[in-house]
């Protein structure tokens, strides 16, 4: 069976143009099948600020109400995702941008409230991950 590399990048890479460029060049050079997982929290916060949507955090974790969910969906699945796809395409790396919701790739359920209700924050259902 062919190897599949799953690599996640965080804000330190996304928020640094030079680091992102270097990472994506290295990622594009991987000849095996690969999946890139990314966030975009700081970008979402900056855009939210411009749109008048306040970012709320408790203990460093984002509180995701309905409006914030719309914002992060736009930023992660749209803006950041498509920027990364465009850069990879420019590096002759065929890339397709999808989210966990696309094709029912990942299912999750709302995280139970313990001490703090983080809103629309969920936990991935391991049995619900489409590995095909």
In which residue ranges do the predicted regions lie?
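Nucleotide/pyrophosphate-binding catalytic subdomain
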Residues: 1-132
